[in-house]
Amino acid sequence: MAEFLPVEPLQWLIPLVAILLLLTIWLIYRRRTSGARRLKRVFAEIGYDRIDNLIVPYGDEGEIQIDHLFLTSQGLLIVDIKDVVGTVFGSDKMQDWAVISEDRRYTFSNPQPSLYDRIAAVSDIVRQVPVAGRILFLDGAEFTKGVPGLVSSLDELASEFGEDDKKAAKVKIEAFKPHWELIQKAARGAPS
């Protein structure tokens, strides 16, 4: 009977530890990339076309940069992404917003005034089309004292700008297309 039992019990431990290590690495990878996949899915759901990293004229002041501009069934949507982890304290009237995480505290300027400037710049180009803007905080951010006006989560963005009736959305999109082409012509850094 002894000849059937393994002589060295550690010979099974090493492969088991290796499998557990690989499984842990895979789970960490999945967790880190799931947010990016979800972001891509929501962007594809709300946007029928998209321009990233464009520069548009802004009145007499020169130019302004826009990170993400979407053609949606409701018009044009400007999205600024804030990838912060922790509790965010901010309001419409506060000049600086604070983030408190487990290991640090920091502040950043209220992003709403610059978003209003971006909305105005795009509105000047596509005058007859609704232009909205949202500051998108990803899943690591939590607002415990109320959410400022233009702030949105991924779920809220999908709910507000997603369109269930794809046929009706297509008609609206076709009406917005000439204005979308205007923004493409006016923009620098965007594909033509």
Protein language model features and the residues they cover:
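Surface-exposed interaction regions that form or flank ligand-binding interfaces
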Residues: M1-I64, F70-L76, V85-T87, S101-S192
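Amphipathic, interface-forming alpha-helical segments with heptad-repeat character
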Residues: K82-A98
